[in-house]
């Protein structure tokens, strides 16, 4: 006899809905579990982009935004429009974090090393934000250089040349591009220090291949068959590296992929790889809060918003037990982001992280660690210990980002198999299960405009399925999931949660 009725949310990361089967890994894959749930049980669609998740109209969602909205149970105004609005109305110039950064650099006389993802993608950054900061720094008389990370993941794989041309046109003439690094190197998040060290080398020590300008770096990469994401870090012109008294300003607003490079640049105790000489940094700031560890080393221009009474807090306050599960790639999303930016687990909250496979790109192993994660999920359900389980399967998103349709099909099929095991365990335990996604990706594997691989997220709706309750389900948005889970758990919905239960 189960001591607790488990209620579970399974997030099929990157599993969007598109009716056309062409270049659609979701529809081309064999998915008997999903198909049976869709045919025989309550189902609906959720909006995961634009204003439905606190982003600008037409802006695709992403995992960070998605999990924030899921956990908060309300539409969370995202950093992208929040920052853009502050730039448009001039408020950013008065932001205490930026004012303090500029004052420190003026006092030290050092150079500002402005860095981040040069991309119109709007997932990790917006290059317009970089240009706005560069103009503010130039106006303040602070010498500034820019370290450009190229995208090709949230944007078409060969779009960096156009991005750099637009960047140069907007940057003040006295702000040069000092280095160029593909995000594969500069924005790792899985402790692959052999990659990060190459980006660090060009930024800190000007140690790497040298080119006359940024476009020459990209052209050299293309000639070698290397797309934007994988551009080998390079030095531009006569850049000589960082010096004592310099400052670091990161314009990415998403936290997870800047933590490693910033730790290497700022943390005197960093041990990921040997550094030639640790520079004495006079000032450091980030567009948003990146982590508790980095808080001790840098300021924040846009501090986090308070998100009280989210899903995790409500469950904990009721004295219930919850479990968060994912492999490495999506572990921060089911913990930190789902908890509204809180890193410390709530009382009664357990966490399981299964290591992601150590491969260069996930098309080489589209199964990733889903089988192990699925086994652990079944064991958790059968344990009778948990009232709420939240699990993320990373495969459809992470393999979708590679642009390989055959690999994405395999990823979807792998996840469907594991979902089958979970459904059986939930039914046996007398529990309830919601299955959905945080955004689309692998349902669109070819770019209709360029004809090339489509590696970015989409603005398509995502399916939502219900097991163990008769429903019916209404269409909605991600912020409606927490109220739905609370209803299944027979817990009251707090006033701060403005989402609506999907169950009629």
Swiss-Prot record:
Cofactor needs:
Mn(2+)
Binding annotation for substrate: 124, 153-154, 183, 189, 254-257, 330
Q: Does the keyword Transmembrane helix apply?
A: no
Top class in the EC scheme: isomerase
Indicate which residues the UniProt annotation says bind Mn(2+) 2.
Answer: 13, 63, 438-439
Keywords, A to Z? Glycolysis, Isomerase, Manganese, Metal-binding
| Pathway named in the protein's UniProt entry | Carbohydrate degradation; glycolysis; pyruvate from D-glyceraldehyde 3-phosphate: step 3/5
Q: A single Pfam family, by name?
A: Metalloenzyme
- List the GO cellular component terms: cytosol
- GO terms (BP aspect): glucose catabolic process; glycolytic process
Task: Give residues annotated as binding Mn(2+) 1.
Answer: 397, 401, 457
Q: How is the cofactor bound?
A: Binds 2 manganese ions per subunit.
Task: Look up the EC number in the record and give it.
Answer: 5.4.2.12
Origin: domain of life: Bacteria
Quaternary structure?
Answer: Monomer.
Its biological purpose: Catalyzes the interconversion of 2-phosphoglycerate and 3-phosphoglycerate.
Q: Which family does it belong to?
A: Belongs to the BPG-independent phosphoglycerate mutase family.
Q: What is this protein called?
A: 2,3-bisphosphoglycerate-independent phosphoglycerate mutase
Q: Which organism is it from?
A: Rhodopseudomonas palustris (strain ATCC BAA-98 / CGA009)
């Amino acid at each position: 006899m189960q001591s607790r009725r488990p209620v579970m949310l399974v997030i099929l990361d990157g599993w969007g809905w598109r009716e056309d089967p062409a270049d659609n890994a979701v529809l081309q894959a064999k998915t008997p579990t999903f198909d049976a749930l869709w045919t025989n049980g309550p189902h609906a669609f959720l909006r995961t982009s634009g204003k439905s998740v606190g982003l600008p109209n037409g802006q695709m969602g992403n995992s960070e935004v998605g999990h924030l909205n899921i956990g908060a149970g309300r539409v969370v105004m995202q950093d992208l429009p929040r920052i853009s609005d502050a730039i448009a109305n001039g408020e950013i110039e008065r932001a205490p974090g930026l004012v303090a950064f500029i004052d420190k650099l003026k006092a030290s006389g050092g150079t500002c090393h402005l860095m981040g993802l040069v991309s119109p993608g709007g997932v990790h950054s917006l290059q317009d934000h970089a240009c706005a900061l560069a103009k503010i720094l130039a106006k303040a008389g602070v010498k500034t250089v820019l370290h450009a990370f190229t995208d090709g993941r949230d944007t078409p794989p060969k779009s960096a040349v156009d991005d750099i041309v637009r960047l140069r046109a907007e940057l003040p003439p006295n702000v040069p591009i000092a280095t160029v690094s593909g995000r594969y190197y500069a924005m790792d998040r899985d402790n692959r220090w052999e990659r990060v060290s190459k980006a660090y080398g060009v930024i800190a020590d000007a140690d790497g291949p040298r080119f006359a300008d940024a476009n020459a770096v990209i052209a050299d990469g293309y000639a070698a068959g290397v797309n934007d994401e994988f551009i080998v870090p390079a030095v531009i012109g006569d850049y000589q590296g960082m010096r004592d008294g310099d400052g670091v300003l990161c314009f990415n607003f998403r936290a997870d992929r800047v933590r490693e490079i910033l730790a290497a640049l700022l943390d005197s105790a960093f041990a990921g790889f040997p550094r030639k000489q640790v520079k004495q940094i006079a000032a450091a700031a980030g567009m948003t809060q990146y982590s508790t560890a980095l808080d001790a080393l840098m300021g924040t221009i846009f501090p986090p918003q308070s998100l009280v009474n989210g899903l995790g807090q409500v469950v904990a306050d009721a004295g219930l037990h919850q479990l968060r599960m994912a492999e490495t790639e999506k572990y921060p999303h089911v913990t930190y982001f789902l908890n509204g930016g809180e890193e410390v687990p709530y009382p009664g909250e357990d966490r399981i992280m299964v290591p992601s496979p150590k491969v260069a790109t996930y098309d080489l192993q589209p199964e990733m660690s889903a089988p192990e994660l699925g086994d652990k999920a079944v064991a958790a359900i059968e344990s009778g210990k948990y009232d709420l389980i939240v699990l993320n399967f990373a495969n459809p998103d992470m393999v979708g980002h590679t642009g390989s349709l055959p690999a994405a099909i395999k990823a979807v099929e792998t996840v469907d198999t594991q979902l089958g095991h979970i459904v059986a365990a939930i039914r046996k335990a007398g529990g309830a299960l919601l299955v959905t996604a945080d955004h689309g990706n692998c349902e669109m594997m070819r770019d209709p405009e360029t004809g090339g691989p489509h590696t970015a997220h989409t603005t398509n709706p995502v399916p939502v399925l219900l097991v163990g309750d008769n429903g019916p389900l209404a269409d909605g948005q991600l912020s409606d999931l927490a109220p739905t889970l609370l209803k299944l758990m027979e817990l009251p919905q707090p006033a701060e949660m403005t989402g609506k239960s999907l169950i009629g």
